[in-house]
Swiss-Prot record:
Binds 2 magnesium ions per subunit. They probably participate in the reaction catalyzed by the enzyme. May bind an additional third magnesium ion after substrate binding. Its main location: nucleus. Interacts with PCNA. Three molecules of fen1 bind to one PCNA trimer with each molecule binding to one PCNA monomer. PCNA stimulates the nuclease activity without altering cleavage specificity. Phosphorylated. Phosphorylation upon DNA damage induces relocalization to the nuclear plasma. It comes from Aspergillus terreus (strain NIH 2624 / FGSC A1156). Mg(2+) 1 binds at residues 34, 86, 158, 160. Its EC number is 3.1.-.-. Its cofactor is Mg(2+). This is Flap endonuclease 1. Pfam families: XPG_I, XPG_N. The lineage of its organism: Eukaryota, Fungi, Dikarya, Ascomycota, Pezizomycotina.
């Protein structure tokens, strides 16, 4: 799930933090990828009739199809992927996971009912909600990656947190995940949509944490508190607190402690904090997650030549893939992993820090843009109000 509407908050308040571009812009870069999030996206990329891709024996193969071809696409574009798998979830997350399981059970029942009485759209909608990544999915994807010569590591707990550690240490250029909470774990750069299919034609979003903090005018502590208030995987959200309210509360009060105090002392009782809301524990999980140091031997990784015959045995003979396509893909892997060894020119130069004048200019432009947006929204609201007040039939 990640952080609710964080992308919206950053895009509206720190637009310079987000850069959208083509996959080939990342040629020569090493990227740590949240494997579980990727596998989940492969599994929900179902056919219109709501069915998973299956082998002749009835085994699901959507995850393997996605992992093989999306990884191939990255390597074709000169990217060197490293997959990071989730370990055991933190205890605080168990409540959220239990809710997700309950929702999936409800969705399974609704899916069966929709197949009997509902529309095709209902069937597909509920089918997507029943999807979950299993140990078998993970094990098969690890086997596939090994045969492809693509490295992977296991995180002690959250994969996004481990990706962030590797990115901060410079072992990879960025962390790649659809979960915005990767920024809470202090990933300097987050890439989104990297493992999407080419058909979706979604540009790769590159989000820079330092620019987001600069645009929001926050330090990391305030940013984490904002993210918890927006709604994260560890806690229930506070009802009626949307992105604009969350941002205002943090800006007005400075910390979650002060926000909680304000809400509890508010005579109007506009907001109600859930009974069990251990925000300090959630904050601690973001500030000090259970991760391995980037120099730990278990964080060593390297790209190797693919095992072509092993891939044919696994994907073609065991899973029913097309042999010509698998052999063609393996040949591309072999060729393009060598090409990706070429260094990017930017690796030879250190980025120049922005001067105070440049920062001030950026902030001024950003503030002007915000004022313009607010003015436009007011004008639109006024026009709507006037249109409603106008008698029907009046020109």
């Amino acid at each position: 799930m990640g952080i609710k509407q964080l992308y919206q908050v950053i895009s509206e308040n720190a637009p310079d933090a987000i850069k959208a571009g083509d996959i080939k812009n990342h040629f020569g870069r090493k990227v740590a990828i949240d494997a579980s999030m990727s596998i989940y996206s492969f599994l929900i990329a179902v056919r219109s009739e709501g069915q998973q891709l299956m082998s002749d024996t009835g085994e699901t193969t959507s995850h393997l199809m996605g992992m093989f071809y999306r990884t191939l696409r990255m390597v074709d574009n000169g990217i060197k992927p490293l997959y990071v798998f989730d370990g055991a979830p933190p205890k605080l997350k168990s409540g959220e996971l239990a809710k997700r399981t309950a929702r999936k059970t409800e969705a399974t029942e609704a899916h069966e009912e929709a197949k009997e009485t509902g529309t095709a759209e209902d069937v597909e909608k509920f089918s997507r909600r029943t999807v979950r990544v299993t140990r078998e999915h993970n094990a098969e994807c690890k086997k596939l990656l090994k045969l492809m010569g693509i490295p992977y590591i296991d995180a002690p707990t959250e994969a996004e947190a481990q990706c962030a550690v590797l990115a901060r240490a410079g072992k990879v250029y960025a962390a790649a995940s659809e979960d915005m909470d990767t920024l809470c774990f202090e990933a300097p750069i987050l890439l989104r949509h990297l493992t999407f299919s080419e058909q979706r034609k979604e540009p790769i979003q590159e989000i820079h944490l330092s620019r987001a903090l600069e645009g929001l005018d926050m330090d990391r502590a305030k940013f984490i508190d904002l993210c918890i208030l927006l709604g994260c995987d560890y806690l229930e959200p506070i009802p009626k607190v949307g992105p604009n309210t969350a941002l205002k509360l943090i800006r007005d009060h400075g910390s979650l402690e002060k926000v909680v105090e304000y809400i509890q002392n508010d005579p109007k009782k506009k907001y109600v904090i859930p009974e069990d809301w251990p925000y300090q524990d959630a904050r601690e999980l973001f500030l000090h997650p259970d991760v391995r140091d980037a120099n730990d031997p278990e964080c060593d990784f390297k790209w190797e030549a693919p095992d072509i015959e092993g891939l044919v045995e696994f994907l073609v003979k065991d899973k029913g893939f097309n042999e010509d396509r698998v052999r063609n893909g393996a040949a591309r892997l072999q060729k393009n992993l060598k090409t990706a060894q070429q260094s990017r020119l930017e690796g030879f130069f250190k980025p120049v820090a922005r001067s105070d004048e440049e920062k001030a200019t950026l902030k001024r432009k950003h503030d002007e843009k915000l004022q313009e947006q607010k003015k436009r929204k007011k004008e639109e609201a006024k026009a709507k109000k006037e249109a409603k007040a106008r008698p029907r039939g009046a020109g």
